[in-house]
């Protein structure tokens, strides 16, 4: 019989799978159900932070405008679970077909998800996506692969 932590980890992994499905479907309403209303997101594009669910969804909606078809992949997800707080980290890649028909492989980012158990549901209260940067040039390094 699985422990409570094992059950919670399975639920969190299901939430991450739902993120992938929501992105692929460009389903803002589906994505909205996965985040706390007061989510704080540190994404790869400005500003430094997106505060609140509306800001997070606006950021996703903007990203979706670039794609005719969009794909999202998560690799090497590691999850650590507490009683009502959990975090996970992984590599993620947004790719697909741009509006002009050009296929893009996208770029791999480092991602962190912080979850809180609210009303028996694991919701994302913070997420972060980043790329390493070259200290000498100050530019992000976007061609690395896991």
Annotate each language-model stretch with its function.
Residues 95-97, 133-134:
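Sequence/structural signature of outer-membrane beta-barrel proteins
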Residues 1-4, 19-23:
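Juxtamembrane and targeting peptides
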């Amino acid at each position: 019989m699985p422990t409570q932590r094992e059950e919670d980890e399975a639920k969190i992994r299901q939430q991450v799978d739902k993120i992938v499905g929501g992105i692929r479907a460009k389903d803002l309403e589906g994505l909205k159900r996965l985040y706390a209303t007061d989510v704080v997101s540190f994404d790869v594009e400005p500003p430094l932070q997106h505060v609140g669910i509306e800001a997070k969804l606006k950021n996703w909606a903007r990203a979706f405008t670039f794609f005719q078809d969009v794909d999202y992949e998560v690799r090497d997800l590691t999850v650590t679970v507490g009683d009502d707080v959990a975090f996970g980290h992984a590599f993620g890649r947004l790719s697909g077909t741009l509006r002009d028909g050009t296929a893009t492989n996208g770029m791999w980012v480092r991602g962190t998800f912080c979850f809180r158990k609210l009303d028996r549901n694991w919701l994302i209260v913070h997420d972060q996506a980043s790329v390493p940067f070259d200290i000498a040039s100050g530019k992000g390094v976007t061609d690395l692969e896991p």
